[in-house]
A protein has these predicted regions:
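C-terminal helicase lobe and adjacent C-terminal extensions/tails of nucleic-acid helicase motors
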Residues: 443, 512-523, 536, 540-543, ...
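Conserved Walker A/P-loop ATP-binding site and its immediately adjacent core
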Residues: 317-342, 349-361, 459, 535
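Post-DEXD/H (motif II) to motif III coupling segment of the RecA-like Helicase ATP-binding lobe
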Residues: 407-485
Length: 852
């Protein structure tokens, strides 16, 4: 720190040079991050990191930069205070002066990183740098003249300080005087193609070496991390985390009941799988293979994945990043982690990070975290420095795809980390070609241990990587299929509207007809789930199953309305146990035999979690508390979108699934008869018609293409299903979870269909940053509005106020919804983001369907 307390000024108010302050801290942290790694040309990354860290801000020594940093006015053009490019020239000089060979590639990457170290949208693009500094144009000529003036200013006012930085960066091999001579030679003649101009023009050459992108991302994200953590004041001993105690997980698993009969056999297989997976980790961490955990739904993947991940992280003395596809699953898994390990999501042991979460680490009284934005606590958590980080596939892979400045700080945490990717089949098919490239980056460049875990392995590495192989962590996956064959849990019933899919027949089922089938399936106290492809389709089916007109007296109970009635009366959300009690009381009063629930992305996250817990979670309450709704004497009908499709631990007697690719069908089937209880469950695959006020069939909206032609996923699904359906129109689960999945992916990747966006993968290989910048795994999220729906008294008091702040917003993550809102109470700006504020007790929010 300088005497005036600002660690980025380089020179304090009293003229004291900040020799051991910001630059030294950044250099030390970059060296630590890069230590032990080489760039793709063999250059030691730590050496380059040290030079970059020491020189990245050296042009702040100009009089104009110093005046700007202190809020003083100066007479020159504002561009005279810019320091990125002149600092990059010093970096290039220093790399050329070190006393051992550094290749042109390493020098180019270092120069590029410093020239773009204040970029916020993405790493610097070599083509952009070439255009800005390698073209013989008046504007570029003016830039070099201005830069030369900046160096003259440093020479006149801070030559000793500049010399000290360069000497440190080059281990005494370079000097400020040497740099000045070097620069002056390289800009002669200033009005012609001088050496600097030629050098930066060549950087735009598209013929780049393999792993150019890897090297660029490594150094740029390392600089972003080191620079931001140093500027925030984070101390070295706060740049780490602690793994949760694995013994707590072992104790939790040991305490689980053994069960009886077929459940006892299932629990034996679950523990056997977990034991095998943990044993397989010992070998996995010594290789560059990608681990696979392939288990049917309900066979204990979550415990197996956590056990394997924690063991591997302990072996590697690193951290665990556990990745899931949906925020709804994250919240459920986070609750389980907190319960098992007795940890807070705001601790150095555990971080929950997704776009709706409140993400920060409590670091004690050492820092101020009152305004959780990019405070030290938020920076620690968003940089994934805790021992265990639970996050989404979107956060992981978008952070590796031309990361923004905010995303960049988490990339160094992946070095030697263990990354468990749960439900990888949920990765959008448009990313199927780039994701293998990014996993190669993790394994080959960052020495990460990657595990893919699902019931429906998509073959991303098998079909998408030329450098990696896979290693199954369970010894005999066939035994789990055999168990399903001898103990049938569900049967898949292919509806007549789907039979013609292989031939392109798009026959559909009306919502009225579908509603009657759902109602029939729910008779005699049966629980029914129907999974739809779109939010509009789910609403249409719900209305067909249970009319929602306010004036109609129907002997049924709707959980969404029960929640809202309770909030109207008390101002607070009920607990899951209270919600059960209220639902049972209302059912008794009305003489109802069915309880209805609805879940989609339009429903507030807090309400979704509340409904899911009320349905299934038997760990809540005490001995006198009512059973979960799915275990009660009432029928439950849940109409939902894919928010329940993977990882949500609910079980129904019958599941209806709108037509979708085979992995989605299998995941929905995993919500049926999970514990092998009673009669064999039934999973019906049908094709729903377009909902009211729409002319688009939902399955084609999500999985189809223009003009009504099915995309490869649906065509291949139809072909595979047609090859396995029996004379009664059914497929056994043991076949569905294995043969059909394998054939589906083989047909996609080995046939002519070629799924995925090749342009994204090619952009990684060619380091085309401009093509990667802003790439979104789920474009729908980016196009939706950010909505804050205040329902409880506390939420409404905070979010409906004119003084809404980042802190208030963070305190109500469970009230935030991403959707295309038709109405809002008002619009507010927080930072650079726009939010629509909705009073959830107004007509803008439906008690059942959520944001309208």
């Amino acid at each position: 720190m300088t005497d005036d307390g600002d660690d980025t000024l380089l020179i304090g108010e009293n003229g004291t040079f900040d020799a051991d302050g910001h630059l030294k801290t950044v250099a030390d942290r970059m060296t630590d991050i890069c230590s032990g790694h080489t760039l793709s040309d063999g250059t030691q990354a730590g050496t380059i990191g040290n030079i970059v860290g020491l020189t990245h801000d050296i042009a702040k020594l100009t009089t104009w930069a110093q005046q700007y940093l202190r809020g003083q006015t100066f007479q020159q053009d504002t561009r005279y205070r810019y320091h990125q490019f002149p600092s990059a020239l010093v970096t290039l000089y220093c790399v050329s002066q070190v006393g051992y060979a550094v290749t042109d590639h390493a020098a180019e990457i270092a120069t590029l990183v410093v020239a773009g170290h204040h970029n916020t949208r993405s790493p610097p693009d070599p083509d952009t740098l070439s255009e800005g500094y390698g073209r013989l144009t008046p504007g570029v000529q003016e830039t070099y003249e201005r830069v030369s003036s900046q160096f003259e200013d440093i020479d006149a006012n801070a030559a000793a300080e500049a010399d000290r930085i360069i000497s440190e960066a080059t281990a005494g091999q370079g000097s400020w005087a040497g740099f000045k001579q070097w620069h002056e030679r390289r800009v002669e003649p200033i009005d012609d193609a001088h050496d600097h101009l030629i050098y930066f023009d060549r950087i735009g050459d598209n013929d780049r070496r393999e792993e150019y992108y890897d090297d660029l991302v490594r150094l740029w994200t390392a600089l972003k991390f080191a620079d931001q953590t140093a500027a925030s004041g984070l101390a070295d001993d706060d740049l780490d985390g602690r793994l949760p105690e694995v013994d707590r997980l072992e104790a939790h698993v040991d305490a689980l009941p053994d069960g009886d009969g077929v459940l006892a056999e299932l629990n034996h297989l679950r523990e056997q799988a977990r034991t095998e997976v943990m044993a397989g980790v010992d070998t996995l961490v010594e290789t560059d293979s990608v681990g696979l955990i392939t288990l049917p739904t309900g066979f204990g993947k979550t415990y197996a994945g956590l056990s394997a991940g924690l063991k591997a992280a302990n072996r590697c003395d690193s951290r665990l990043v556990y990745v899931l596809p949906y925020t709804s699953i994250l919240d459920q898994t986070a609750n389980e982690i907190q319960s098992i390990f007795d940890v807070s999501p705001y601790s150095k042991q555990f971080t929950l990070h997704h776009h709706l979460s409140t993400t920060y680490t409590g670091l004690g009284d050492r820092y101020t975290d009152a305004d959780i934005g990019r405070s030290p606590g938020a920076l620690h958590a968003e940089s994934w420095l805790s021992g265990l980080t639970l996050t989404t596939t979107v956060q992981l892979f978008e952070s590796l795809t031309a990361p923004t400045a905010r995303q960049a700080t988490r990339v160094p945490a992946l070095d030697q980390a263990v990354v468990v990717i749960d439900e990888p089949q949920a990765i959008p098919d448009s990313w199927w070609q780039i994701v293998p490239e990014l996993i190669e980056l993790l394994v080959n460049s960052y020495d990460a241990t990657v595990i893919l875990m699902t019931a429906t392995q998509p073959g991303l590495i098998k079909y998408g990587s030329d450098t990696l192989d896979t290693r199954e962590l369970t010894e005999d996956t066939d035994q789990y299929r055999d168990f399903l064959a001898t103990h049938p849990r569900v049967v898949y019933d292919i509806h007549e509207t789907v039979h013609g899919q292989a031939g392109g027949d798009h026959s559909t089922l009306s919502y009225a007809a579908a509603g009657k089938e759902v109602q029939t399936a729910a008779s005699d106290r049966q629980n029914v789930l129907a999974v739809c492809n779109t939010r509009d389709s789910a609403e249409a089916l719900y209305r067909a199953v249970r009319p929602t007109s306010e004036g109609e007296s129907v002997a049924s109970v709707e959980l969404g309305r029960v929640i809202h009635d309770h909030v109207d009366a008390t101002g607070e959300l009920p607990s899951p146990v209270t919600l059960r009690e209220l639902a049972f009381e209302e059912a008794d009063e009305r003489g109802a035999d069915t309880i209805y629930a609805f879940l989609s992305g339009n429903v507030r996250p807090d309400d979704r979690a509340l409904i899911i817990d009320a349905l299934y979670n038997d760990d809540l309450g005490d001995a006198s508390s009512p059973d979960p709704l799915l275990n009660s004497a009432y029928s439950v009908i849940l109409i939902a979108t894919s928010v329940v499709e993977a990882g949500v631990d609910v079980s129904f007697d019958t599941v209806f699934r709108d037509y979708a690719p085979i992995p989605n069908i299998v995941q929905s089937g995993g919500r049926c008869n999970r514990s092998f209880g009673g009669e064999t469950g039934r999973v019906v695959i049908w094709r729903l018609a377009e909902p009211p006020d729409s002319n688009a069939i939902p399955s084609l909206v999500i999985h189809g293409g223009d003009g009504g032609d099915a995309l490869p996923l649906l065509r291949e699904t139809g072909r595979v299903l047609a090859g396995h359906v029996d004379d009664e129109g059914c497929i056994d689960e043991s076949v569905m979870v294995s043969d059909t999945v394998d054939e589906f992916y083989a047909g996609l990747f080995e046939g002519p269909l070629d799924p995925g966006d090749e342009q994204l993968a090619t952009a990684v290989r060619s380091a085309s940053i401009a093509e990667l910048e802003g790439a979104k795994m789920i474009n729908e999220i980016d196009s939706y509005d950010d909505v804050i729906a205040g329902l409880t008294d506390t939420e409404r008091a905070d979010v409906l106020t004119d003084e809404l702040t980042v802190s208030m917003l963070s305190n109500h993550a469970g009230a935030q919804v991403n959707t295309d809102a038709d109405a809002a109470t008002r619009e507010v700006m927080i930072g650079h983001s726009t939010y629509l504020v909705v009073d959830a007790r107004s007509e803008a929010y439906h008690p059942v369907f959520g944001v309208l």
